[in-house]
């Protein structure tokens, strides 16, 4: 289903938080939404891989890498794992790599920047913990909506089929 964050902000202005415009789109889908699962980690993606092994239908993985872009937290292998397990999208407060592959995959991916250096695969970090970046606090179980215009956060599922959005 198509997501239009501009229209969501117009309709649900009192219900949503808008993430600062610091992200770019790197995946094959330009818009996506779902219930948030968070991973907080620093230059390692072992926990990310573990979470992406789970069923992802209706879910978006939100990775807080501290805004560090020295190492890519998502690469082609992890993005493909997400696709294989039905994840709707990935948002990374950090870097990604292998853009030529990422842009062909049937998943939305937003991140700060690309870099060719990969992360280590240690299992250091936290899963399903509140994280704060881009001017908002993301709580596990919140809903996130993303498109090429921006990222919007809501504590509850928004009606994307509203006549106002059509």
UniProtKB/Swiss-Prot annotation:
One BP annotation, GO: regulation of RNA metabolic process
Keywords: Cytoplasm
GO MF terms, alphabetically ordered: endoribonuclease inhibitor activity; enzyme binding
Name of the protein: Regulator of ribonuclease activity A
Highest rank taxon of the organism: Bacteria
GO cellular component: cytoplasm
Family: Belongs to the RraA family.
Gene3D superfamilies membership: Ribonuclease E inhibitor RraA/RraA-like
Species in which this protein is naturally found: Glaesserella parasuis serovar 5 (strain SH0165) (Haemophilus parasuis)
HAMAP family the record matches: RraA (MF_00471)
